[in-house]
């Protein structure tokens, strides 16, 4: 089988290419150029750097497979960077990696695979695609410590047959051992933790450089008493504790961001919790609505048991209500994933614009 391998220059995608080649597949390596400096150069820090591209090229040469770097900077800028800035300007917390998977990577990789006569696209994500009866489901990886199903929740049923996750049953230590046995230079390369277009810089400076947040505003408590000032709502996210004025020795958190009135509300941790929530833009991958679920609101966080209340969606936003047994703090994040069953298989794709953390009743 001819397979396009999405190569990031890291150990995971390197091993995917190596494993598929050793299994007799016709492998083609492709790296996306997503972000560039003012002179068209690839960034030096973060992920998707010039060094990463060079590492991917050397791995491809070691494995003796064709390798290409394709330029998708325009698509990335429009769909990911603009979205990143827009979300912060609305007082919401974006997830650029999820947005990149949704709007850029998988669509373009699948399209490129078709052009190269490849039957599948393989990536180094830790997740599994499992057949159940006549449909495919997205499951968590066996190695839960690195499970990445959360950042893949946007994958729709029509895309799953075109994708392969060879690392779904392999642990990270095993991946590094395989890389070393294949003589790949990425065997002990550290995983990137940075936002590719921000790197090690403060995201606030990046956002403020792209939109005018020059007007200062007030930091207030839940009774609207002024307790401080801020230089722009983009510097805050709901649930944030660092840099928040305290009081009476108790930590304070951002509980609400009022963009229209340029106010940042702060309160106690208890002010962030509720049992009832509204979620928007819910779609069910296999068309079946599950009731007893668990929800994950950020990468590598614990699942929270919840109940999805069935009923007709409100308007075109596909709005649904759900609740938890105990009061929880589910913040105003852009992305969340639902899971169902003992194996935590992935019945629902959520591409929500935001959580609305408010009581339903």
Predicted regions and their residues:
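ATP-dependent adenylation/nucleotidyltransferase module used to activate substrates
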Residues: 1-153, 180, 254, 344, ...
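AMP-forming adenylation/ATP pyrophosphatase catalytic core
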Residues: 122-130, 134-349, 353-355, 360
């Amino acid at each position: 089988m001819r397979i396009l391998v999405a190569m990031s220059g890291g150990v995971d995608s390197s091993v995917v290419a190596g494993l598929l080649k050793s299994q007799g597949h016709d492998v083609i390596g492709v790296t996306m150029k997503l972000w560039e400096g003012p002179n068209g150069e690839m960034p030096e820090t973060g992920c998707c750097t010039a060094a990463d591209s060079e590492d991917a090229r050397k791995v491809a040469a070691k494995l003796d497979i064709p390798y290409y770097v394709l330029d998708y900077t325009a698509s990335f800028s429009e769909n990911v960077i603009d979205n990143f800035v827009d979300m912060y300007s609305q007082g919401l917390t974006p997830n650029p990696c999820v947005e990149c998977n949704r709007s850029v990577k998988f669509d373009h990789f699948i399209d490129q695979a078709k052009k190269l006569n490849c039957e599948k696209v393989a990536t180094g994500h830790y997740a599994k695609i499992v057949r159940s009866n006549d449909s495919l489901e997205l499951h968590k990886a066996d190695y839960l410590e690195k499970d990445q199903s959360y950042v893949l929740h946007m994958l729709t049923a029509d895309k799953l047959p075109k994708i392969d996750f060879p690392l779904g049953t392999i642990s990270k230590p095993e991946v590094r051992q395989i890389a070393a046995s294949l003589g790949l230079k990425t065997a002990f390369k550290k995983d990137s933790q940075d936002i590719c277009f921000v790197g090690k810089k403060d995201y606030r400076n990046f956002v403020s450089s792209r939109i005018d947040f020059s007007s200062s505003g007030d930091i207030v408590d839940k009774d609207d008493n002024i307790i401080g000032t801020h230089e722009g709502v983009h510097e805050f996210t709901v649930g944030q504790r660092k840099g928040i004025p305290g009081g009476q020795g108790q930590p304070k958190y951002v509980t609400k961001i009022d963009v229209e009135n340029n106010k940042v509300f702060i309160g106690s941790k208890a002010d962030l919790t509720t049992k009832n929530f509204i979620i928007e833009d819910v779609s069910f991958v296999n068309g079946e609505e599950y009731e007893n679920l668990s929800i994950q609101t950020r990468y590598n966080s614990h699942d929270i048991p919840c109940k999805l209340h069935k009923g007709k969606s409100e308007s075109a936003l596909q709005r649904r209500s759900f609740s938890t047994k105990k009061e929880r703090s589910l913040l105003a994040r852009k992305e969340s994933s639902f899971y169902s069953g003992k194996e935590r298989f992935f019945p629902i794709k959520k591409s929500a614009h935001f959580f609305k953390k408010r009581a339903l009743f």
